[in-house]
């Protein structure tokens, strides 16, 4: 079922204005990339050892990554590539709860021409990625796009939105935007009209606009993303995107904000000086970042995985400033997993010191995949999904491991109650541990998604438990499903059944110190969505919706009588914590009379600081305050109108 309209009043104004002017926006091309600096001593620039002096690439060594990995070569006719991509898109465009997973990979080369551009669309559970060492190694003259879906069961008709456009990605390529053959509106931008779990990474958008909404369909055209990192673009049209994080990128211009547009380490980011009139939150640098690992083909035709180093106080894309250093791992260092392999095979490979490359598909995991060795990489392709079986915790990272990277993986709760879906354990003994120096996180999570319910019944006590220190979260979505195909009937949209069956008490618990997050999205859990007990937490963009489905106020009241649970809770004993750009939304669909006391709850201490936070009503339910007892009430008398707190505590 569709998610409800969000922010209807302000978004309609924005959409109407954009529809009139956006096609007139002049395509803007950024200048050439800055010359890359030499890598620091002891560091290896990506592909350095094997890249030839010329830009020519020999044929890639044959690599079998399974039937759901499609590899394109620039010698293939554009029509053939489009036909194959279209057949996958037509299968996946409405397949929100399906088990199909796809990875579309492009070998180094140039695809499409000015007269005959390559134009493809991206559906659910589909990854589109270049196989070059640099985004400039794969050039698409054309488009890679996501459009609105026009839903026949929406609350109004027509109902064309991107609110449910989840679980897809594009990375590591250059797009020379070319709309030849499309109508005037469609030709005006490369559209990426997606919501959560739809990352854009390591892309270079040239010669045209990048639009994060689809303004070419009928209305209401809502979107609720989103994440862009390590990328470069000219004009970016935010449009109806309610919230968005842009990290370590370069932009020429940004059209507008809605509720919570956040920028960290981004060249050309808009100023936050007029907040909340302009809803921008801008940090000049990113405190700690580590880019997502990716597959590439080196100069000899060998397939490798590049694992980037961490950066501190960084700004701009690593590939434009000579900072794309790291390790290049051969595929022989990985266990290349298939969905039909039992969990014991994957666990055994980890125990033998192998990294894991999860090819596209859904994996049944009846025992924990335990990571004990430092520097282990678990990389998923095509939204690879691990489903908990028998109440398992699919991934556990032992406390002694450091430098671990888990990326591109979705973890589903199963029908048996899990204690957690991922557990990052604390180091045993006394003291703190980094193992690689102060800049390398103990574990990094890039594009890791958690799901409770949706395609099937799911149950977990907590989705993600972080007991380790020095963890880096870089774009995760932790989602207890507000809709699905489980067959629920009781309550609004089956919500009473959903509340009683798809149990997820807590979304994220952070007990470790110095845990950092760039892009933390947590939604619909039955008590706390996020509880942060560790010291020196640092969060850049937090997005939360409270659960839609409590049957009554009694179900949404704490034992001490407090009305509801805040969407973001900092532990009472915490001395130091920072949050930049946060939003908590309420849509109590099952009982619109439900009230929540506050969106954010934090201890009143000088070291605990929230910067640019808000609450908003989405037509049902109310929140009395934004932070503790500060900030105006939001309710259905003014749906879509946020209540902002610029700084808490006030300066």
Where are the language model's segments positioned?
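Secretory targeting and sorting signals
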Residues: 1-38
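Extracellular/periplasmic carbohydrate-active domains that bind, remodel
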Residues: 21, 33-651
